């Protein structure tokens, strides 16, 4: 009976310890590589095209002590529903570590009240979050959040855009690693 109790206690201790190790924050290097995929955007600011299809290309690579992230979004929106207009948006951000583990500051991040974009990133467990904040001349802010979460099958993207507290757009998608 004592042997069974000890065995059960041992198994319980292993099971209880597993989630803690599974929830450790990954290193930024785990995200390095080229990623490709697609998703769907839900837009509050569009009358005719509330949902649009998007393609994504993301490259995350080392840059000094930090990292650089380049991404391209292909947006199919507007025009004739059978032949929508296609636009490409490209962005590049370079981030360096702060004194806080898992927190990075943008190398050319500015003062949003002076018309400059402010951005930073946070690494928490298996999610790399990038935040961008802008303030217009009337003091109305826009906050964008890109969550890139690694899973066994690749990367999950969740994007949210708020303007003065109101949801403007949400994008969800999946990406797979397409290169180093």
Located regions from the model:
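Hydrophobic/aromatic beta-strand elements that line small-molecule binding cavities or substrate pockets
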Residues: 54-61, 93, 116-121, 143-150, ...
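Acidic, glycine-rich flexible loop segments
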Residues: 111-152
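Short beta-strand segments that buttress and anchor functional surface loops
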Residues: 70-73, 106-107, 129-136, 145, ...
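Positively charged n-region of N-terminal signal peptides that target proteins for export
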Residues: 1-5
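Sec/Tat signal peptide C-region and signal peptidase I cleavage site
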Residues: 18-22
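Short, solvent-exposed loop/hinge segments that bridge or flank secondary-structure elements
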Residues: 25-26, 32-72, 83-89, 141, ...
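Predominantly extracellular/secreted and cell-surface proteins with exposed
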Residues: 73-128
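Bacterial N-terminal signal peptides
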Residues: 7-16
